[in-house]
């Protein structure tokens, strides 16, 4: 068996009301090359998600699950899954896969190959596309600059254009829907910040990976379908609240210290002033 064929990837899938896609997600993860172990962490689903997970676990010894009695948030659950992979010492790579991501057989192995080219000192994401083939703008992002957002609305766009000349494109951040990094790097940066309940935890992790001297990049040659928003449709207000809360936390953690009191107050007003409008749009969304 060559290095490219070694099964040393531990996959973490966090679910919450994910019954629409979890069967397809796990079927594809189980068929993926290089997977040594799979850990599903369910955050108190009440829609039959756990029954689907249990069925997969019954026929694949690599798959085990944690059933949380409540919903501690995505970041906490990701850390739980990574911790649950501590025993299989052959899972030297960690892949965090959303339950609405449909990987191809070679997707994870190819992400691992890209990370290996950077001596494992990298966090790598995929070229995410919707079911309609449209690219997910969250797959390639720059860090938020909230002071710039106060000056011009255009600065609120975080997406970065794809560079077709590069198979591996360095960016500030990739989407948490699918990311792969070495266990060593994950532990070096302390994993996910569990204070994020939902949204911006991926921006935070990518920022700390870069601050640790590692590379964040998206593999433009690894395309994966991401059926966005499956879990969030049932709780639009909850999602919008924590999206805004996550952005405010990111600002306080990484940007606020170098901004004046006036700028900090203006950013607070901008972030939370936008929440009622975003919440109304979410409620009216079909």
Whereabouts are the PLM-identified features?
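Short, acidic, metal-binding catalytic loop of nucleotide-sugar glycosyltransferases
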Residues: 27-36
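A conserved acidic beta->alpha catalytic loop
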Residues: 42-51, 70
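Glycine-rich, basic loop-to-helix element that forms the pyrophosphate-binding segment
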Residues: 67-88
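Short beta-strand-to-loop acidic/aromatic patch adjacent to the donor-nucleotide binding site
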Residues: 89-102
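Conserved donor NDP-sugar-binding/catalytic core segment of glycosyltransferases
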Residues: 102-137
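Short, flexible, basic/aromatic active-site loop/helix in glycosyltransferases
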Residues: 143-172, 176
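A short, conserved alpha-helix in the catalytic core of glycosyltransferases
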Residues: 172-191, 195-223
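Active-site-adjacent helix/loop segment of glycosyltransferases
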Residues: 204-285
């Amino acid at each position: 068996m060559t290095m490219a064929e070694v099964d040393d990837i531990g996959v973490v899938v966090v679910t919450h009301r994910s019954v629409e896609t979890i069967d397809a997600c796990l079927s594809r993860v189980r068929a993926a090359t290089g997977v040594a172990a799979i850990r599903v962490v369910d955050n108190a689903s009440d829609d039959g998600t756990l029954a689907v997970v249990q069925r997969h676990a019954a026929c694949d010894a690599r798959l085990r699950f944690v059933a949380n009695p409540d919903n501690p948030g995505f970041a906490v659950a990701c850390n739980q899954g990574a911790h649950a992979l501590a025993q299989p010492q052959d899972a030297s790579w960690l892949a965090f896969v959303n339950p609405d991501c449909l990987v191809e057989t070679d997707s994870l192995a190819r992400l691992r190959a890209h990370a290996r080219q950077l001596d494992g000192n990298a966090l790598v994401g995929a070229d995410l596309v919707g079911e309609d083939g449209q690219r997910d703008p969250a797959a390639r992002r720059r860090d938020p600059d909230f002071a710039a957002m106060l000056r011009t609305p255009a600065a609120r766009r975080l997406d970065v254009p794809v560079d077709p000349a590069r198979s591996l494109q360095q960016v500030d951040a990739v989407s948490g829907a699918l990311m792969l990094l070495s266990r060593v790097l994950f532990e070096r940066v302390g994993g996910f910040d569990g204070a994020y309940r939902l949204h911006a935890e991926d921006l935070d992790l990518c920022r700390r990976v870069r601050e640790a001297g590692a590379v964040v990049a998206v593999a433009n040659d690894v395309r994966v379908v991401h059926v966005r928003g499956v879990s969030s449709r049932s709780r639009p207000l909850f999602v919008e609240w924590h999206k805004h809360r996550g952005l405010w936390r990111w600002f306080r953690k990484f940007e606020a210290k170098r901004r004046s009191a006036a700028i900090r107050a203006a950013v607070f007003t901008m972030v939370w002033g936008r929440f009622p409008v975003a919440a109304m749009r979410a409620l009216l969304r079909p």
